[in-house]
Curated annotation (Swiss-Prot):
Pfam assignment, any one: Cytidylate_kin
Single Gene Ontology BP annotation: pyrimidine nucleotide metabolic process
SUPFAM superfamilies named among the record's database cross-references: P-loop containing nucleoside triphosphate hydrolases (SSF52540)
Name used for this protein in its record: Cytidylate kinase
InterPro entries: Cytidylate_kin (IPR003136), Cytidylate_kinase_dom (IPR011994), P-loop_NTPase (IPR027417)
GO molecular function: ATP binding; CMP kinase activity; dCMP kinase activity
Record-listed E.C. numbers: 2.7.4.25
Entry GO terms, CC: cytoplasm
Family: Belongs to the cytidylate kinase family. Type 1 subfamily.
Organism: Rhodopseudomonas palustris (strain HaA2)
Superkingdom in the source lineage: Bacteria
Catalysed reaction equations from the record: CMP + ATP = CDP + ADP; dCMP + ATP = dCDP + ADP
UniProt keyword annotations, A-Z: ATP-binding, Cytoplasm, Kinase, Nucleotide-binding, Transferase
Subcellular location: Cytoplasm
Length: 212
């Protein structure tokens, strides 16, 4: 079984992905980490993010061993990842890695921006997670503070809105809800409430009931 979770930055899809994977005993892949790893490699090498050739080369040399690097969660790396993820050739290189992960038994949960539309269009369950931008900015600020980093909520909100515009407007795999994805708005849900709602969606789809 493949569960695809898509949504904008800081919508809570990563947390839901981890919890759903644990609940069902599936493997989990935060596909945003893939792009962040490539972006960090470019930043560490002093590369020009507008140089698509360098970005493609970094994607081809992706090292999964870097996925656990805490530095990948930084705002700088996140912004850089948003830039390179708009390059069609970079996405093309990384599609194979994601699809191979999804195909391995017993099942997988992948979260990102284009899982249900591009990476796994035939996923058994598709969930599109959204949340109010202000709520997302507040959550991101709290995460940064928990890591001991300074966090200006207004600056974070402005960045989130810019990233939303960039993700929705890019020509390569723009952020959008798949026609058969179930919408989950977790603006007013805590983590446990969001997890319960996501599990209910999975169970409803598995039972053949489209509406929940």
């Amino acid at each position: 079984m493949i569960i695809a979770i898509d949504g904008p930055a800081a919508s809570g899809k990563g947390t839901l992905g981890k919890r759903l994977a644990a609940h069902y005993g599936f493997r989990h892949l935060d596909t945003g980490v893939i792009y962040r790893a490539v972006a960090k490699a470019l930043l560490d090498g002093g590369a020009d993010l507008t140089d698509q050739a360098q970005a493609i080369a970094a994607a081809q040399g992706l090292d999964p061993g870097l996925f656990g690097d805490p530095a990948l969660k930084s705002q700088t790396v996140g912004d850089a990842a948003s830039v390179i993820s708009a390059y069609p050739k970079v996405r093309e290189v990384l599609v194979g890695f994601q699809r191979q992960f999804a195909a391995e038994p017993p099942g997988a949960v992948l979260d990102g921006r284009d899982i249900g539309t591009v990476i796994c269009p035939d996923a058994d369950v598709k969930i599109f997670v959204v949340a109010d931008p202000g709520v997302r900015a507040r959550r991101r600020a709290l995460e940064a503070q928990a890591r001991g980093e300074p966090a200006d909520e207004a600056v974070i909100l402005a960045d989130i809105l810019r990233r939303d515009e960039r993700d929705k407007g890019r020509s390569a795999a723009p952020l959008k809800q798949a026609p058969d994805a179930v919408l989950l708005d977790n603006s007013n849900l805590d983590i446990e409430g969001g997890v319960r709602a996501a599990i209910a969606i999975v169970e409803a789809v598995r039972a053949g009931r489209r509406r929940v």
